[in-house]
């Protein structure tokens, strides 16, 4: 279509997107408000388990979830097609697949392991935020989840690493009046002087990709552990720390 490659998977992606969007609008029409902040498509009640629910009582959520997975999967496969046509690696669809994995973990894998679709999150702005808050408090302090710590660390490290790279590039190609534009060797020299090491212009992008994918994978893992594999408050998980032999020294 014009300059955009569509292909078979582009068509299937468009189908799932339009169907899912129409179902969200239908669900909003069944609800009490058209306030964009308050619209919510909730999953079935826990009493339905892993069964199919009536449309107005969670069935729409189930179909919308199928549409979302279909749209995301189609888009990833479309990216594979485009990558092959361009003769490049599959880095982009592989990276997007990690984001898809995180979504599927939240809406399919974790609810399956916990025995009810009602453990998925609702589709809505405020209702989604409420779900995040309630899920966190269900485990007393979610920040004590070790994989949550890893995920947050990787998210912030991704931002820091790519911000350092981006700011250096802007500084190199926008010199003060009277100075020449700097190139990669100047950038390498700057970081060798700054922190003693330069990963290089290609390496920083690979590092950014690695950190970002690690953050997505760790975030999926942290919620997957909560419920199916750990049902207590996360602070109590750290009890092993108090029993390390090192604390026995000094008579304590």
From Swiss-Prot:
The chain crosses the membrane at residues 8-30, 58-86, 91-113, 146-173, 200-225. Keywords: Bacteriochlorophyll, Cell inner membrane, Cell membrane, Chlorophyll, Chromophore, Electron transport, Iron, Magnesium, Membrane, Metal-binding, Photosynthesis, Reaction center, Transmembrane, Transmembrane helix, Transport. It is found in: Cell inner membrane. Coiled coil: none annotated. Its main location: membrane. The keyword Methyltransferase does not apply. A ubiquinone binds at residue 191. GO terms for molecular function: bacteriochlorophyll binding; electron transporter, transferring electrons within the cyclic electron transport pathway of photosynthesis activity; metal ion binding. One of its GO terms (biological process) is photosynthetic electron transport in photosystem II. (7R,8Z)-bacteriochlorophyll b binds at residues 128, 148. GO terms for cellular component: plasma membrane; plasma membrane light-harvesting complex. InterPro entries: Photo_II_D1/D2_sf, Photo_RC_L, Photo_RC_L/M, Photo_RC_L/M_CS. Pfam families: Photo_RC. Fe cation binds at residues 165, 205. Reaction center is composed of four bacteriochlorophylls, two bacteriopheophytins, two ubiquinones, one iron, and two highly hydrophobic polypeptide chains (designated L and M). The reaction center is a membrane-bound complex that mediates the initial photochemical event in the electron transfer process of photosynthesis. This is Reaction center protein L chain. It comes from Acidiphilium cryptum.
